[in-house]
Amino acid sequence: GTWKGEQGGAILSHSIHIHDLISMIFGPVSNVFAKLTTRVNNIEVEDCAALSIEMGNGALVTSSITLGAAEDVSRLKICFNNLTVESGGSPDKPYNPAEDEWKFLAREPITQNQVDEVLSSVELTKSWYAGMFDEIGKKLDGFNSDEVTLLDARESLEFVTAVYNSSRKGKNIYLPIGKDNPLYNSWLPD
């Protein structure tokens, strides 16, 4: 865990895909406030983080990250107006929540039967690289696709930049990140 080697810690390595998933669901990030620290491991980079994120659509997201838990888990809980969605947080699938057990819980006026009916019509898709290559294949064949684009990658890196910048400055950082951001070319500490 060095700045020279990995060039980032838990934000860059362990939680980046969860944050990408949040952006896929809610759209672009508007701003982030981050507290990062190293508390558990003898490394240079962060191993713990607490993030407060506001999405462009107004949704609020909190994210807590630690490399000090007894078990490696990725757990998501997403609360909509009439639906709560929870991943199982299985230690058997810490880096693949898509293949974990999920709960979709209705809240009035939506009924659980309505939710279950919608879920029964959803096709399972592949995850990891198999899923990525399926989406690229769809795009190449002229079909609608959820392939990851260069814009997605840029927005992900801008989010990481905003997180590191926020932690160092102690303030909210708004996205998108431009060339005027002091961390635009490097996240390495001074």
Model-derived regions: residue spans:
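Glycine-rich phosphate/pyrophosphate-binding beta-alpha loops
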Residues: 16, 64-72
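Predominantly a Rossmann-like dinucleotide-binding segment in NAD(P)-dependent oxidoreductases
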Residues: 1-42, 170
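C-terminal glycine/acidic-rich active-site capping loop/insertion
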Residues: 77-151, 173, 178-190
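Conserved loop-to-helix N-cap of the C-terminal "lid" that shapes the substrate pocket in Rossmann-like
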Residues: 12-15, 147-153
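A general structural signal for well-ordered alpha-helical segments in protein cores
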Residues: 18-19, 129-134, 160
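A short, glycine/Asx- and small/polar-enriched loop/turn
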Residues: 44-48
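Short arginine-rich
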Residues: 159-169
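Active-site beta-strand termini and strand-to-loop segments that position acidic
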Residues: 51-58, 78-80
